[in-house]
Amino acid sequence: MAKKIVGFIKLQVPAGKANPSPPIGPALGQRGLNIMEFCKAFNAQTQGVEPGLPLPVVITAFADKSFTFIIKTPPATTLIKKAIKLEKGSSNALSTKVGKITRAQLEEIAKTKLKDMNAANVDAAVRTLAGSARSMGVTVEGL
């Protein structure tokens, strides 16, 4: 018989840097899950990823206090900022432009993110990412 699911917990955790401090500790503790077990398993699975890169993770909590988790790809905005070596987006995206990104760079990001996006193909994913870039105050070239 399948285990009874009692809830889902969505967090953004830096790769390889999961520890019991907030936000992880309180979120898992409320459901009675073993915090250190999650931290060790998460850090082990994210060894090959750039340390500190924020990764969305969905934790499924079961009635017997066990859990499973799925690690998703980094947020699009993080990948865009990394691609154009930007610290943060524009505070006023319409008037203040903070950088430029090319279609080729967006295609690279789209290939990485495609499995987590609801886009039919790479071209649709590129257009979605271009919208995210524009809302950050980044000029999109070649689209």
From Swiss-Prot:
Which biological process terms from the Gene Ontology are attached to this UniProt entry? translation
Q: Name one Pfam family in it.
A: Ribosomal_L11_N
* PTM summary: One or more lysine residues are methylated.
Q: Which domain of life is it from?
A: Bacteria
Which keywords are on file for this protein? Methylation, Ribonucleoprotein, Ribosomal protein, RNA-binding, rRNA-binding
GO molecular function terms listed in the Swiss-Prot or TrEMBL record: large ribosomal subunit rRNA binding; structural constituent of ribosome
The record's GO CC annotations read: cytosolic large ribosomal subunit
PROSITE patterns for the chain? RIBOSOMAL_L11
InterPro entries membership: Ribosomal_uL11, Ribosomal_uL11_bac-typ, Ribosomal_uL11_C, Ribosomal_uL11_C_sf, Ribosomal_uL11_CS, Ribosomal_uL11_N, Ribosomal_uL11_N_sf
Q: Which NCBIfam families match?
A: L11_bact (TIGR01632)
Function noted in UniProt? Forms part of the ribosomal stalk which helps the ribosome interact with GTP-bound translation factors.
Please give the family membership noted in the entry: Belongs to the universal ribosomal protein uL11 family.
Q: Which HAMAP family match?
A: Ribosomal_uL11
The UniProt subunit note reads as follows:
Part of the ribosomal stalk of the 50S ribosomal subunit. Interacts with L10 and the large rRNA to form the base of the stalk. L10 forms an elongated spine to which L12 dimers bind in a sequential fashion forming a multimeric L10(L12)X complex.
Q: What is this protein called?
A: Large ribosomal subunit protein uL11
Q: Which organism is it from?
A: Paracidovorax citrulli (strain AAC00-1) (Acidovorax citrulli)
Phylogenetic lineage: Bacteria, Pseudomonadati, Pseudomonadota, Betaproteobacteria, Burkholderiales
